[in-house]
Amino acid sequence: MAAAVLNPGFFLLILLLSFSISPSLQYVSESEPLVRFKNSVKITKGDLNSWREGTDPCSGKWFGIYCQKGLTVSGIHVTRLGLSGTITVDDLKDLPNLKTIRLDNNLLSGPLPHFFKLRGLKSLMLSNNSFSGEIRDDFFKDMSKLKRLFLDHNKFEGSIPSSITQLPQLEELHMQSNNLTGEIPPEFGSMKNLKVLDLSTNSLDGIVPQSIADKKNLAVNLTENEYLCGPVVDVGCENIELNDPQEGQPPSKPSSSVPETSNKAAINAIMVSISLLLLFFIIVGVIKRRNKKKNPDFRMLANNRENDVVEVRISESSSTTAKRSTDSSRKRGGHSDDGSTKKGVSNIGKGGNGGGGGALGGGMGDIIMVNTDKGSFGLPDLMKAAAEVLGNGSLGSAYKAVMTTGLSVVVKRIRDMNQLAREPFDVEMRRFGKLRHPNILTPLAYHYRREEKLVVSEYMPKSSLLYVLHGDRGIYHSELTWATRLKIIQGVAHGMKFLHEEFASYDLPHGNLKSSNVLLSETYEPLISDYAFLPLLQPSNASQALFAFKTPEFAQTQQVSHKSDVYCLGIIILEILTGKFPSQYLNNGKGGTDIVQWVQSSVAEQKEEELIDPEIVNNTESMRQMVELLRVGAACIASNPDERLDMREAVRRIEQVKT
């Protein structure tokens, strides 16, 4: 019997049918383990109702799920939902391409679940839960692809598992704020890819391995481990008693060879010293109070850690000019508390020498208004304001002052313009005061003296992007959603485009763009500050104070340009998207993340998704937009400025990104 001849088209039909059927089968197979995972835990602060069996987890509708190329589940990011119960890791083994698990800020407890069964994991983030107990020493031996491990702010006990030090690709390890004991494995110092090691706030003991201290490009935090000594922690080991582990004694702790009688004598001496010190402060307080009564016309606005002080000395009016200025200050409510007629003289400097002076009403000692959108005020109004130190920046110190009218302002004392003549300073300040753009912080006023320059601007209650992104872990930080971060990036881009048009003739229209100079309004609208200062600074001061001088081109050619501002914009874009503090902001480059190298290498390997801050990843569609924006940031930080986007093109591409 002749064999039947099959039409080749039949095989093609079978092949096409298999392709058309396989995606739906993939959806079903991946939705089932996710639904089982959802059913195994309790949710107290939200829901996962979008997780429905038989639907496509990669449709963009499943909360907290993101997918690789929109086809297969690669990440589970379920945070702040009050999850509790038992995680069955076996359910997740049916997700073959799962790379990231993020369950931080929940209520999960008990021993660490058996995540070692998921050998393909690259990121495991379990911060801020209540996991407890010891972690098996060999727990991580099969997780060779793991890059980021966050176990911080839990209740883990025992020693650090040695298998962690055998993870060849590990870049970040966070185990701070647990109850870990024992010594730090020296093998951390030989882990080639390790960039961040945070073991702070534990009960670790012994000598910090020299290999960790010697490792370059490693950000280490070992603070609040009482019994550690040696390098990194800067605690000598002379007073550390290393116990014989065979004796079963507790971990090594500081010991003392001083007899008990000597201790009692020392305590008595300390008590006597404290009593004398208290008596001294009482005497000083009495003297100060008497001096205040004799000299009520001297007030200190603020001081900082470097003993810089902001002082305002009020002297009796003694000239016709002073009389006129006093009259004008009375109209503004600027007379002194005791009803006497005063004139304002700024005295801002180290040690409060009390020198210098000039009449109000436009004289050397007055506040010059350049923007009256928030009303007018004078130096006496600032003098009567409650003031506090905000901090020190690369250009000087900043102080917050709340005036009696309720207006809160920031007074920035700029230390690197002391040799600047009055005329160029006046011209620039008045020009700044005319700027109007929703993303530019326009100064309200300024004060000129040969020795001191002050710039007054409106206070932003949400502070800077730097603080909200890295320093605050409260409500402000939690509100930095993907939509909010995109709004900030686009606002910064619009502001920079405006500055590059307004100051097109300047080498650096901004020159100092970084997250500390991006302030946030109540609605998270970004306002750019500290711009266009280059013409006002001495070249030597500018190269030290302005961030644009940390660009690759300045290091290579000692030149800066408009493209240097583009580089700074790229750093901010990447900082916002990754949530990482850039090491580029630090003078010594130690600490933070080398965000340029990290991004460039990941983009080259087409691993952009791994760079995105897990806190803002919700679905596949938003991930696509984030990656697109990240590529714009990467195009802004090319080492060769000729290969960077120009500002106009960068802004155009940023505007195209939608939430």
Curated annotation (Swiss-Prot):
Residues 1-26 form the signal peptide. Glycans are attached at residues 128, 179, 221. Changing residue 234 to A: Compromised interaction with LURE1.2. Reduced pollen tube attraction. Changing residue 226 to A: Normal interaction with LURE1.2. Residues 324-341 have a biased composition (Basic and acidic residues). Disulfide bonds join 58-67, 229-237. The modification Phosphothreonine is found at residues 484, 557. It is a single-pass type I membrane protein. Interacts with ROPGEF8, ROPGEF9, ROPGEF12, ROPGEF13, PRK3, LIP1 and LIP2. Binds to LURE peptides via its LRR repeats; interacts with LURE1.1, LURE1.2, LURE1.3 and LURE1.4. This is Pollen receptor-like kinase 6. It comes from Arabidopsis thaliana.
